[in-house]
Amino acid sequence: MNHLDRIGVILAGGKSTRFGRPKAMVQYQERYFYEASLDALQHHTDQVLIISHPTLTNQFRRNEGIRVIEDDPRYQGCGPLAGIFTAIEKESAYWYLTAPCDTPFLKKEIYDILFSYLDQEPDKKAVIPVVNGRKQPLIGLYHRSCLAPIQSLLEQQRYKVGFLFQLVDTLFVEDKAFEQLHSSFVNINRPEDLSEWT
């Protein structure tokens, strides 16, 4: 299999328990939440992969040209780390650009900034934005070499993405431009969260 330089990965394998229905399929301003992630990623790669919850797979597959797969059965229900693992295991690339399915204001410029920092430190294996002192691991860049450490964490049932950063050389990016793009990092967990933006 030939390696692509980059693959976009939309993480949509969660249960949306707090929202009460699948967040990816909620509409804001006449488009689904996940479409903001799709738009942002498609500016940086020709291939976008959706890691889907089993109940949404058929709906996502209506998108022509978008590959849709479910979490590796060994790790279904184990959170975003399982989604990143599945993407790296199933699709061959050097870099995986991740995005959640519940960030309806995500902008492509976030990835421009992350890649600009990676260009300065190309040996890093993960590039993660930090906004107001908080790491944002679901909007990031992950090198294919993260596969083995992620699998090790999953086997140990250590499901927090943050554990990965203790194992791989990670670049944490704090950039003033994130202040103007702060809405990109707003994830919608409850219906009332969305009402604040309407």
Swiss-Prot record:
Transfers a GMP moiety from GTP to Mo-molybdopterin (Mo-MPT) cofactor (Moco or molybdenum cofactor) to form Mo-molybdopterin guanine dinucleotide (Mo-MGD) cofactor. It comes from Halalkalibacterium halodurans (strain ATCC BAA-125 / DSM 18197 / FERM 7344 / JCM 9153 / C-125) (Bacillus halodurans). GO terms for molecular function: GTP binding; metal ion binding; molybdenum cofactor guanylyltransferase activity. HAMAP family: MobA. Belongs to the MobA family. GTP binds at L11, A12, G13, K23, D71, D102. Its EC number is 2.7.7.77. It is found in: Cytoplasm. This is Probable molybdenum cofactor guanylyltransferase. Its cofactor is Mg(2+). One of its GO terms (biological process) is Mo-molybdopterin cofactor biosynthetic process. InterPro entries: MobA-like_NTP_Trfase (IPR025877), Molybde_CF_guanTrfase (IPR013482), Nucleotide-diphossugar_trans (IPR029044). Pfam families: NTP_transf_3. It catalyses: Mo-molybdopterin + GTP + H(+) = Mo-molybdopterin guanine dinucleotide + diphosphate. One of its GO terms (cellular component) is cytoplasm. It comes from the Bacteria. Mg(2+) binds at D102. The N-terminal domain determines nucleotide recognition and specific binding, while the C-terminal domain determines the specific binding to the target protein. Keywords: Cytoplasm, GTP-binding, Magnesium, Metal-binding, Molybdenum cofactor biosynthesis, Nucleotide-binding, Transferase.
